Amino acid sequence: MEKNVKSSVTGISSQVSTHQLETKTQFTKYHTRGGHGFAAEDANAMYDRLQGKKVDMCGRDNALNGADRIVDGVKIQTKYCQSAQCSFSKAFDTTGQYRYSGMKLEVPSDQYAEVVTKMKEAINQGRVPGVTDPNQATQIVTKGKYTYAQAKQIAKPGNIESLKFDLTTQAAACAFACGISAGITFFIELQKGATYGDALKEAAKVGGKTGGLALLGSVASQQFLRTTIGRNCAAAATKAVKPAVQAAMKTEVGKNVITKTASVMAGKQVFGSAATNVVTKALRTNAVVSSVMFVATTVPDVVNVCRGKMTAGEAVENAACNASGIGGGCSGASAGAAVGTMLCPGIGTVVGGIVGGIAGGIGGSTAMKKLISLFK
């Protein structure tokens, strides 16, 4: 039962991880020429959230001269360039006027002092509309939490800065997996007649293992998607799932489910092709994340086979059950979330996803075990 719980919760965790990737990062742009700028936006936004601030990543609409994000009602434009002069000049239009009136200009922490000096000069020159006091430069320019070099590293795979960023953004998936698996295990142990103390010990053990596995898989997924191979896999997944989403949009029920699900994910009302794109991207990312999660659950068994602690047959059986559990968990979570969204967007989405994921994951893993037993 422990393995069933772990595989099903891992499947649900991949959904949580996908949600974090799609809503909290712009990972698909990290590999571009200005990818470090998007990484800087994401990293600084993450820091704001950790401080308990409300963050709206409004800049994804690419509005001309619009804010990249709004933090507790304050509009912020992020400029992370190679030099302070470049970061500063990017905030001014071709006529030499400050482009982002009423917004704070966020720059790399190591360029802050120099940009403030340049902003004071611009104010004295009358190039900042509505501002005449050069001392207000410190109120316009805000110090980013990361240096230019750190932002460059966050956009790339396989380094300390990007790993730290991924660990932080995916902590939610880990905590979710740990809590859900511990709760299920505790209930199962009590049903089996265990004492509260023993049930808590087993719940803590299973929860810790599952949470750690979820974190490993989530971080590995985020790192993998930064690589060329990862991006190619994501592109292939997009081609595979998009026709299905488009076909579903042609039915009334499918259109309703996709529109509501996309709106919950986007945090605002989206319709038509916009809703199709949101759901397609989520399914694409989830396909990659689930695959990485499967590898993460399989590697320990491969190691045990090499050490002689497990037979190859047992490893294959576990792999098949893990695949079924993760797949069932993902499918169940998706279906449950869709139904929950139709009934009550938001709360219904979460509850439906959890219930559907657990049922689908345990059901898939159990069914695979029974199928394998027929050939023994």
Where are the predicted features?
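Helix-termini ("caps") and immediately adjacent flexible loops/tails
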Residues: 294-310, 315-325, 357-376
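Short, surface-exposed, charge-dense and proline/glycine-enriched linear segments
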Residues: 84-98, 346, 360, 364-372
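Glycine-rich, hydrophobic membrane-spanning regions of integral membrane proteins that mediate transport
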Residues: 1-34, 43-61, 69-75, 81-291, ...
